[in-house]
């Protein structure tokens, strides 16, 4: 068995839905980061490119991203979808391929754009077709199970583990405070790949407070 190592990585600034990246397709965002990764680490032709994507942007979007970045057409690329764990699972798959001796160098990660994800519609032959033109959330559970969205899943997990809202609020405040500190001190600059004119992460809230969190429904 070969050992697998993470040699480095880059990420874009993180946006929000309908924010600074709202008009930029996922494959373009991913391609811009991929180009900078390949330049920084001098990777011309990796054995594979593996990318996670959970919103179902259609086709083999990892390969679309790779070709958009100018990667040679001979380099195989494929997409992994395990929803929120897609990017991390891509890295695990890459490690397994290297462990097995199938590959030596793989670029792995994940990318999403909820702002530009395609609309979806059932074919009239599908049993769930109701005449509606579009649906916003894909089906994850068969009819014998109730669909559970991620927020409900988080609530169930918190209840099972005995985690209170007050405990989570403290983590929220700590997280935003540390993220703000890291941004102000430039601690993340060596892993940031600036793309599409972005200059900062949109999700960090320097003014986050307990008063704001108290407004949220319990």
PLM regions: where:
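Extreme N-terminal starter segment of soluble prokaryotic enzymes
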Residues: 1-6
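N-terminal extracellular/periplasmic Venus flytrap/periplasmic-binding protein-like
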Residues: 11, 23-32, 167-218
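Active-site pocket-shaping loop/turn-to-helix segments
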Residues: 11-38, 55-56, 78-92, 104, ...
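Short acidic, glycine/serine/threonine-rich loops at helix termini
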Residues: 17-19, 59, 116-122
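Phosphate/pyrophosphate-binding loops at sites that engage ATP/ADP/AMP, CoA/4′-phosphopantetheine
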Residues: 35-47, 157, 161-163
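Conserved catalytic cysteine-centered active-site region
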Residues: 52-103, 144-149, 207-218
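Active-site-proximal alpha-helical scaffold in enzymes
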Residues: 82-112, 158-188
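Flexible glycine-/small-residue-enriched beta->alpha junction loops
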Residues: 105-156
């Amino acid at each position: 068995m070969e050992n697998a190592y993470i040699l480095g990585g880059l990420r874009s600034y993180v946006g929000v839905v309908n924010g600074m990246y709202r008009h930029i397709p996922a494959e373009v965002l991913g391609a811009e980061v991929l180009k900078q990764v390949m330049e920084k680490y001098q990777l011309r032709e990796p054995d594979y490119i593996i990318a996670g994507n959970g919103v179902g942007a259609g086709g083999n979007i990892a390969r679309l991203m790779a070709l958009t970045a100018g990667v040679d057409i001979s380099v195989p690329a494929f997409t992994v979808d395990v929803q929120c764990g897609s990017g991390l699972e891509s890295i695990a798959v890459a490690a397994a391929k290297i462990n097995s001796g199938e590959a030596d160098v793989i670029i792995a990660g994940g990318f999403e754009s909820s702002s530009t994800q395609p609309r979806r519609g059932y074919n009239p032959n599908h049993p769930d077709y109701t005449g509606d033109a579009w649906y916003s959330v894909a089906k994850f559970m068969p009819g014998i199970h109730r669909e559970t969205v991620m927020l409900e899943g988080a609530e169930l997990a918190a209840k099972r583990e005995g985690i209170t809202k007050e405990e989570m609020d403290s983590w929220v405040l700590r997280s935003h405070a540390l993220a703000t500190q890291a941004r102000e001190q430039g601690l993340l600059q060596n892993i940031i790949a600036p793309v599409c004119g972005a200059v900062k992460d949109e999700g960090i809230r320097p003014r986050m407070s307990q008063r704001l969190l108290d407004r949220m429904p319990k």
